[in-house]
Amino acid sequence: MSNPSLVRSNWTRKEVEALFALPFNDLLFEAQTIHRQFFNANEVQVSTLCSIKTGACPEDCAYCPQSARYDTGLEREKLMAVEKVLEEAKAAKDSGATRFCMGAAWRSPKKKDMPYVTAMVKGVKEMGLEACMTLGMIDKDQATELAEAGLDYYNHNLDTSPEYYGDIITTRTYQDRLDTLDNVRHAGMKVCCGGIMGMGEDESDRVGLLLQLANMPQHPESVPINMLVAVEGTPLEQQEALDPFDFIRTIAVARILMPQSHVRLSAGREDMNDQTQALAFHAGANSIFYGEKLLTTANPESNKDMQLFKRLGINPEKREEHKTEQEQVEQINQQVAEAALDKVFYNAAS
């Protein structure tokens, strides 16, 4: 079903700018057409995010309520006990999640913390869930240790374009982020990497971010596209909200540039109406965080997400290795039927 020739790592700025400049309907049509060549258009991956260590981060990311530099009313919490994390993971699985993501507000994990986080990874994997972590910058040895524990994904976002980055963060360089991503790849883990929209950047910065992601030697397997949640006490608390159509355009371009990646509709969904989320799915978003909280910010209630899925005819994506033989047969039959349908549409238009 997929077309490998569509997967490229040599995009030019001019090409990406041309995609952003397409009429809205044309852009979404192209994104949806490509999406259907690589994914079931009516399935969305469901992940759950758990904050395993909250607050007191020494970094100065202008959007983040967990920075120790800002007075956001967030209380510092110690690293969560392994048993508690695994309880959260079990609850996530029982609610339908297939991936469990764990986030810690660190610049980078300390040596004394590694036995605890690797124990969390092993416990999550034993439940049959995919495991993802975001712990800040990690070196080669830490990446190897996490990989050996069974970690599937490591999240480390680029946040924005190289040009706008210095306006948002000064305590960690863009190259620091790229180095961590290289360490993750070298250890054999999958990469989760995206950015945040609506931080005051312009379209050229959204072009620049997606260009960085799409021209990596291997595309991130997961690309979270976040909408800024302007938290009181952070430098961006008064930031004007991004036009939803600009947000949808970014998702659509991400889908076209990285056709094999899961594009995650991530932070900011609490402030999106159902119509905006439906457009995001049509533009190629096929992953969400499920649960009432994302680290420290609100997220739509779980039953609200399932109600929206039902209205749109969307089903939660299942992990391939956990599909039954009958489900695999049904999937193959569906793909054959879709291929035949595509051929009919093609002939009708010719």
Swiss-Prot record:
Amino acids binding [2Fe-2S] cluster: C101, C132, C192, R264
GO biological process per UniProt: biotin biosynthetic process
Keywords: 2Fe-2S, 4Fe-4S, Biotin biosynthesis, Iron, Iron-sulfur, Metal-binding, S-adenosyl-L-methionine, Transferase
The enzyme's E.C. designation: 2.8.1.6
Binding site for [4Fe-4S] cluster: C57, C61, C64
Top-level taxonomic group: Bacteria
Cofactors (names): [4Fe-4S] cluster; [2Fe-2S] cluster
Free-text remark on how the cofactor is bound: Binds 1 [4Fe-4S] cluster. The cluster is coordinated with 3 cysteines and an exchangeable S-adenosyl-L-methionine. Binds 1 [2Fe-2S] cluster. The cluster is coordinated with 3 cysteines and 1 arginine.
InterPro entries registered for this protein in UniProt: Aldolase_TIM, BATS_dom, Biotin_synth/BioAB, Biotin_synthase, Elp3/MiaA/NifB-like_rSAM, rSAM
Ranges where the Radical SAM core domain occurs: 42-269
This protein's pathway: Cofactor biosynthesis; biotin biosynthesis; biotin from 7,8-diaminononanoate: step 2/2
Pfam families on file: BATS, Radical_SAM
GO molecular function terms noted in the UniProt entry: 2 iron, 2 sulfur cluster binding; 4 iron, 4 sulfur cluster binding; biotin synthase activity; iron ion binding
Catalysed reactions, as listed in the record: (4R,5S)-dethiobiotin + (sulfur carrier)-SH + 2 reduced [2Fe-2S]-[ferredoxin] + 2 S-adenosyl-L-methionine = (sulfur carrier)-H + biotin + 2 5'-deoxyadenosine + 2 L-methionine + 2 oxidized [2Fe-2S]-[ferredoxin]
Enzyme class name: transferase
Function: Catalyzes the conversion of dethiobiotin (DTB) to biotin by the insertion of a sulfur atom into dethiobiotin via a radical-based mechanism.
Family stated for the protein in its record: Belongs to the radical SAM superfamily. Biotin synthase family.
Self-association and partners: Homodimer.
Name by which UniProt lists this protein: Biotin synthase
Taxonomic source organism: Saccharophagus degradans (strain 2-40 / ATCC 43961 / DSM 17024)
